């Protein structure tokens, strides 16, 4: 009885072609899906749009405002505040001189305003700011040093920045006034969505 030898089908060329074809489709779809994101980032950079994903303010998009009356300010912290916020990763990598990202906070007190710091929170010209009390530790139980209690008059060339949206916000309740020269730009909300923020 003779054994019949059957030649295996020639799949090399076809398989190679199909592999290249699938790879090409994958690259194409990746480019198509990434294009809107890239275009969005470019448009955001051109039109001054910032995406906020931090819990200090409602998450969403904010746009640059050329009006100094816009109370949301983007600034680079200085001194100990810059070091702590970077070491503890309150800030990501960004464009500030220390290599960290700018902070986005509401400016709540301006030159000439009276700031009263107490254990229960902060008052601006007698008006109490919700969720403004300094905490003894952060959300990971690392120690914090709140700004000393007392009455302060906001000096020329400085502002106080405090977020009432989140009691864990790292702002002037820990480092006092910031120099106006550290402000990079003013912003206003463009499109935001409310999120539940843990309070203490």
Identify the function of each model-found stretch:
Residues 2-200:
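Extended hydrophobic leader/signal-anchor segments used for secretion and membrane insertion
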